[in-house]
């Protein structure tokens, strides 16, 4: 054990508690790594310097356009598992249909996961009256929350937040594509918590490997991280982490924390990330980032502006039916047309978001609207002047 850790009053038995405490205080980079590891080199491999805010001089992103008939999904009073709220749906497109796996809350205030299906991405005419995934393990006793779906080969991997009433952790489960399509929910396989004992949320897997390693976005407050692993089993390694983006300074829209949103979407210009940020008034807004196609730890673009903020009645949550007012928060997005593996500037995406943590809404934008023209020009190898 590092002598600096002992000098600080720590011992081996208390190490896990110390790790959780320092990360929860947002002191992970400068305090925890060198305290435990003792050398700057080793520390930088695990917790390198954060990107403090938007890259200087970058142009603003275009705004998302709300679907005219929001919300696309509401609670159902006679469904016990979702009689109070539905929110934060992970989305995946299979065989031409959009499958929305969403967080459902009933009278017991425990989060379970429901399923709705749409032919056009907006009208969800098929909907189950029972959950497809519910708490079973101790770590998720009080809820399985905020699912995000990624297809890797012939399996669908789902990251979600496991909540035991005290700590929220990133958990991972998977199911064969065929079993999902045929609704064989007993085929779900739980892989466990990804970073056991650490308060962590907003996780999403990339659908491809990078140098034979899988990659996952997640958030240890207040930063957005990317982590690599040679395997998909849990737990993931303690090394191969990088802080991708940090909360901004001052009174910006993402000043207190920033985190992931939808699963990564592959575009010709990079991996498109719909993110979220929170300000000092505790208002949740959406933003956008772009990371390199071959190295998702390389941030290419971070929107200086938000692309959606709470404005309408569903998002502001002014009535007694709303759970948390002034929130827009996404867990999923899909291409509007077709199932293209890589999107171009004129391809449109549908972003699903929880509004006031109470209903699910949809918004759209073309990739070219979210990624500014200058950046798209430069990514094609041209010089912008």
Regions found by a protein language model. Give the residues of each.
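Canonical pleckstrin homology
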Residues: 329-330
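Beta-rich carbohydrate-recognition and catalytic domains
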Residues: 2-84, 88-142, 151-204, 208-256, ...
């Amino acid at each position: 054990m590092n002598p600096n850790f002992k000098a600080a009053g720590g011992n081996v038995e208390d190490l896990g508690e110390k790790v959780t405490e320092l990360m929860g205080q947002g002191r992970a980079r400068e305090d925890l790594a060198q305290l435990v590891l003792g050398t700057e080199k080793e520390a930088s491999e695990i917790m390198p310097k954060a990107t403090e805010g938007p890259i200087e001089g970058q142009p603003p992103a275009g705004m998302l356009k709300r679907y005219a008939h929001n919300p696309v999904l509401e609670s159902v009073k006679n469904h016990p598992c979702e009689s109070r709220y539905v929110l934060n749906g992970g989305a995946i497109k299979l065989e031409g249909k959009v499958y929305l796996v969403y967080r459902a809350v009933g009278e017991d205030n425990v989060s379970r996961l429901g399923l709705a299906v749409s032919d056009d991405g907006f009208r969800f005419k098929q909907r189950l009256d029972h959950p497809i995934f519910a708490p079973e393990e101790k770590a998720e006793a009080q809820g399985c929350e905020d699912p995000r779906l990624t297809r890797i080969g012939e399996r669908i991997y789902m990251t979600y937040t496991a909540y035991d009433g005290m700590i929220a952790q990133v958990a991972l489960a998977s199911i064969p594509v065929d079993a999902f399509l045929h609704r064989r929910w007993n085929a779900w396989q739980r892989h466990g918590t990804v970073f056991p004992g650490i308060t962590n949320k907003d996780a999403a897997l990339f659908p491809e490997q990078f140098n034979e390693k899988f990659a996952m976005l997640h958030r240890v407050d207040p930063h957005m991280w990317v982590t690599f692993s040679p395997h998909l089993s849990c737990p993931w390694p303690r090394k191969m982490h990088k802080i991708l983006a940090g909360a901004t300074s001052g009174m910006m829209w993402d000043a207190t924390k920033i985190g992931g949103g939808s699963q990564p979407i592959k575009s010709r210009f990079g991996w498109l990330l719909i993110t979220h940020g929170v300000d000092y008034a505790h208002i949740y807004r959406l933003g956008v980032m772009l990371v390199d196609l071959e190295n998702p730890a390389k941030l290419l673009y971070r929107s200086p502006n938000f692309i959606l903020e709470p404005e309408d009645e569903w998002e502001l949550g002014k009535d007694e039916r709303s759970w948390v007012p002034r929130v827009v928060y996404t867990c999923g997005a899909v291409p509007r047309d077709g199932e293209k593996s890589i999107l171009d500037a004129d391809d449109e995406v549908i972003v699903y978001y929880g509004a006031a943590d109470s209903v699910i809404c949809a918004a759209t934008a073309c990739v070219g609207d979210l990624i500014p023209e200058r950046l798209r020009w430069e990514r094609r190898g041209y010089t912008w002047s």
